[in-house]
Amino acid sequence: MIVRKIDDVTGTRNHVDTPGWFSRRIVTAHDRVGFSVGETVLRAGSTNDFWYANHVEAVYIVSGEGELYDKDNDTTYQLGPGTMYLLDGNEKHQVRVRSDITCVCVFNPPIVGTEVHDENGVYPLLELPPEPAGQA
């Protein structure tokens, strides 16, 4: 069993801070459970372009408001508390933030915890080496 508090990862390599958002990765590929979980805060007034070409991501909005723009289908969705969106088709998208959005993000395959988006909004696919025999 793994039990962690958000403060356990704050200020560590699993706490990634950028101009538009910061993310604290609570469960990562290092935990070897097949997915990762993080809390991300998208900053008010920011516009963020993302494209998870290597991952499926589920996002659950806990607080804040904004818009999700699906670049592939030219469709805009309103975001607020209780909203979930699932990027299951590697959709290019943009999040426009009206008030700080706090969300819980789940990735498959799991992220290692240090990823940042490249110039295309993509996380690289970083994988851990397999555990030595008898270590699993």
Each predicted region: which residue ranges?
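Short histidine-centered beta-strand/loop micro-motifs
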Residues: 29, 47-53, 70, 77-78, ...
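Conserved short histidine dyad/triad with adjacent acidic residue
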Residues: 23, 36-53
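Short acidic-glycine-tyrosine-enriched beta hairpin
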Residues: 73-90
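Glycine- and acidic-residue-biased ligand/ion/polar-headgroup-sensing regions
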Residues: 54-67
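A cytosolic small-molecule/anion-sensing beta-strand core signal
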Residues: 62-63, 80, 99
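A short, N-terminal "cap"/entry segment at the start of jelly-roll beta-barrel domains
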Residues: 1-35, 116, 120-136
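A short hydrophobic beta-strand segment most commonly corresponding to one strand
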Residues: 39, 58, 86, 100-116
